[in-house]
Amino acid sequence: KERAMHVGRKKGQIVDTVVQEQRPSVLLELGAYCGYSAVRMARLLLPSARLLTIELNPDNAAIAQQVVDFAGLQDRVTVVVGASQDIIPQLKKKYDVDTLDMVFLDHWKDRYLPDTLLLEECGLLRKGTVLLADNVICPGAPDFLAHVRGCGRFECTHFSSYLEYSQMVDGLEKAVYKGPGSPAQP
């Protein structure tokens, strides 16, 4: 059974709220798919802000670019084709990113933790950077959840919801980076 893999309306409202609260100047999305969430988030950004969205599948990236162009948001959104683990280390030099204000994780769930660690290792997270991860319950990202909730460097909030267009329990995890030296809380 196939399903639409975008964030959907209900979880999209949670994403909207987080973007509106954070007001990011530089937002990174991991997993563009068809461009739905990129457009959804970019429409809420200030005109001077930018969103970079990384998509592994070139066909999906081409569709995402068309959707972004159709929405008139091509000045704010850059669609980057490639593997997240290859692109993240290039963000500072090739894409002129100092640090990220927000990261929306919605790609391969087994990449959530390695990419979070890579973002930190590359110096792209700053105190206050918000990670917002979709589908942390279904299909799930247990290693990511264990890390952000247990390492002491993130302040976490869970938003319960349902998998897009179904009644399967799912959720988003908001993890606010406290800095590299934050001690674990007992």
From Swiss-Prot:
The keyword Metal-binding applies. Its cofactor is Mg(2+). S-adenosyl-L-methionine binds at V7, E29, S37, E55, L56, G82, A83, S84, Q85, D106. It is a single-pass type II membrane protein. It catalyses: a catechol + S-adenosyl-L-methionine = a guaiacol + S-adenosyl-L-homocysteine + H(+); 2-hydroxyestrone + S-adenosyl-L-methionine = 2-hydroxy-3-methoxy-estrone + S-adenosyl-L-homocysteine + H(+); 4-hydroxyestrone + S-adenosyl-L-methionine = 4-methoxyestrone + S-adenosyl-L-homocysteine + H(+); 2-hydroxyestrone + S-adenosyl-L-methionine = 2-methoxyestrone + S-adenosyl-L-homocysteine + H(+). GO terms for biological process: catecholamine catabolic process; developmental process; dopamine metabolic process; lipid metabolic process; methylation. One of its GO terms (cellular component) is membrane. It is an enzyme of class 2 (transferase). Its main location: cytoplasm. The modification Phosphoserine is found at S182. Keywords: Catecholamine metabolism, Cell membrane, Cytoplasm, Lipid metabolism, Magnesium, Membrane, Metal-binding, Methyltransferase, Neurotransmitter degradation, Phosphoprotein, S-adenosyl-L-methionine, Transferase. It is found in: Cytoplasm; Cell membrane. Gene3D superfamilies: Vaccinia Virus protein VP39. Substrate binds at K109, N135, E164. The keyword Lipid metabolism applies. Belongs to the class I-like SAM-binding methyltransferase superfamily. Cation-dependent O-methyltransferase family. Catalyzes the O-methylation, and thereby the inactivation, of catecholamine neurotransmitters and catechol hormones. Also shortens the biological half-lives of certain neuroactive drugs, like L-DOPA, alpha-methyl DOPA and isoproterenol. This is Catechol O-methyltransferase. It comes from Sus scrofa (Pig). The gene is COMT.
